[in-house]
């Protein structure tokens, strides 16, 4: 197919000026074209993040999902707002993809926001929000992670159980003791 050959030629040439044209493929109503665009952008050696984020806002659901997956794959922390927007306004399928992508686009600066979202998340959103909090904390030293999570647990009141998985992910014995104690008192 000519479109496929042309697309892969652009990828092989690798000129970053082709990125917006490749990102346009995500806006197609043809799922095969969207998948071609996703594969091409995933293989492209340059910085695709800005063009992909721009395409997500006006793409159909398949293109939004493909774009979110690309942003996650590229760890596009600068484009976290694109992912957060889709959590707010996307269709159920797009929201699910945005929640999955979230853990890959968060950084240390997003800890407070991610904790707030975890504490207000509905039941289906809790697991991906916990993964996002764990990811946001990951650049901190372990002792700081434990301290930050323990502080958030105190602030969360009766929603402190939401942080058990996050606290356990630190692997610290005192953190694990807190989790065990919490389970015992809540069961």
Residue ranges and their predicted role:
Residues 3-15, 24, 32-46, 51-54, ...:
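Structural detector for internal amphipathic alpha-helices that build alpha-solenoid repeat scaffolds
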Residues 6, 143, 150-154:
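Extended interaction regions within the primary functional domain
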Residues 46-50, 145-150:
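Repeat-mediated protein-protein interaction surfaces in helical alpha-solenoids
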Residues 18, 114-115, 145-149:
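HEAT/HEAT-like alpha-solenoid repeats
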Residues 17, 187:
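Conserved functional loop/turn residues at catalytic and ligand-binding sites
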């Amino acid at each position: 197919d000519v479109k496929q050959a042309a697309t892969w030629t652009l990828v092989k040439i690798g000129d970053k000026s082709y990125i917006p044209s490749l990102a346009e493929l995500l806006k197609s109503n043809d799922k095969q074209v969207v998948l071609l665009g996703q594969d091409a952008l995933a293989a492209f050696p340059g910085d695709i993040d800005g063009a992909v984020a721009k395409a997500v806002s006006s793409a159909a659901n398949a293109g939004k999902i493909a774009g979110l997956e690309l942003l996650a794959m590229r760890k596009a922390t600068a484009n976290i707002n694109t992912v957060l927007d889709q959590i707010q306004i996307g269709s159920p399928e797009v929201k699910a993809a945005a929640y999955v992508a979230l853990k890959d686009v968060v950084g240390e600066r997003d800890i407070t926001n991610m904790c707030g979202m975890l504490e207000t998340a509905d039941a289906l959103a809790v697991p991906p929000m916990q993964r996002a909090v764990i990811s946001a904390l990951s650049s901190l030293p372990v002792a700081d992670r434990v301290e930050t999570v323990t502080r958030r647990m105190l602030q969360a009141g009766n929603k402190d159980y939401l942080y058990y998985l996050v606290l356990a992910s630190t692997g610290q014995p005192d953190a694990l003791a807190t989790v065990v104690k919490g389970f015992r008192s809540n069961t």
